[in-house]
């Protein structure tokens, strides 16, 4: 039960504390070497929300809803920054369903970058597979929604994606994505 991970005295809380300690040890090595890192923890928390028999999402950190998720995020943030003194971290909140991102957003004080995962190549073969035809749209409605979510205070990234929007479409649609991270080899190696 994820709700127990934010309750002191529970085995889930103790386990999460150990996980954060292990993570902090590794991040400390990077801080000692003056290496900044974009950390995208607890990503896609609302992924597939409500589509399982118990109404939960596909990752454990989202399985008890937005309020518990935000508590978990803030616990992670506070522990790493205040208890362990890690200040080389750029915190990235990664939405899955942008339509309800505001419900899950941990808040401007705990986030540096907002991000979205885009998988929307054209699936137009009879077998349901991608034809390889990339969707070059800049998906500006999603970009604009995430930009407005933070009142323009945060940069907006495409943290996972298949095809990359065309430069022309990003200019036309005024969608200034901070970066892209193609997730599959097909999209890394194709034009």
Predicted regions span which residues?
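Substrate-binding cleft of secreted/luminal carbohydrate-active enzymes
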Residues: 153-191
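Solvent-exposed loop/turn segments at secondary-structure junctions
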Residues: 43-47, 96-101, 118-123, 161-165, ...
């Amino acid at each position: 039960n994820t709700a127990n991970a934010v309750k002191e005295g529970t085995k889930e809380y103790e386990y999460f504390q150990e996980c954060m300690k292990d993570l902090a040890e590794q991040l400390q090595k990077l801080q000692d070497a003056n290496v900044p890192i974009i950390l995208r923890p607890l990503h896609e928390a609302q992924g597939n929300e409500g589509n399982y028999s118990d109404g939960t999402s596909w990752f454990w950190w989202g399985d008890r809803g937005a309020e518990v998720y935000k508590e978990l995020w803030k616990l992670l943030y506070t522990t790493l920054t205040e208890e362990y003194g890690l200040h080389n971290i750029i915190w990235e909140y990664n939405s899955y369903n942008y339509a309800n991102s505001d419900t899950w957003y941990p808040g401007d004080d705990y986030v540096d970058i907002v991000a979205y995962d885009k998988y929307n190549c054209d699936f137009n073969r009879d077998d349901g597979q991608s034809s390889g035809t990339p969707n070059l749209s800049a998906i500006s409605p999603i970009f604009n929604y995430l930009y407005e979510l933070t009142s323009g205070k945060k940069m907006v990234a495409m943290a996972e994606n298949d095809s990359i929007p065309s430069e022309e479409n990003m200019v036309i649609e005024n969608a200034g994505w901070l970066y892209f991270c193609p997730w599959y080899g097909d999209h890394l190696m194709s034009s």
